[in-house]
Amino acid sequence: FLETISRRGAYLALLQQYPPALHKLADVIGSSSWAADYLTRHPILLDELLDVRLFDPTPDWQTFRSELRLRLAQHVDDTEREMDLLRETHHAQVFRLLAQDIAGLHTVEHLADRLSELADIMLQTTLDLCWQKLKHRHPHPERPPRFAVIGYGKLGGKELGFASDLDLVYLHDDPEPDVGELYARLG
């Protein structure tokens, strides 16, 4: 981990300038190899150590969703930036939940609920975003899609862990002929 952040002077300066962030970092990377690997893959998350919401154990999911949609709306013509923003937002929230877990703020069940809620929000937001880009191909673009994303496995059981993948099935029930390919692209 230190090798990764030592390549960027800004990260070292941040840790030097904010000793409490360095202590939080030591707690996180000292607690599990998964946490250290996660930060190694996403060193930008060091900024989260300065966020006052880091240890807020009950995310306000409505505000989270609204803020994410507002930030996405600023990049409506830049799909790459939208995808980056979705990833960055997800990584930051996972890191917050990880820090809270390490601090003992969640039971296993409560943490699984929070991770599952996060996955639900990210899936719905992504689906909405993709539909906005594809709906012009539908015979009735003003109608909502007749499309469902079904989570099974750990997501379906609301038992997600930090390293869980998402097992998904996509279903559509649209009476319009020739929309199967559109829904396949949406999935």
Summary of predicted features, one role per range:
Residues 1-187:
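Non-catalytic regulatory/linker segments of enzymes
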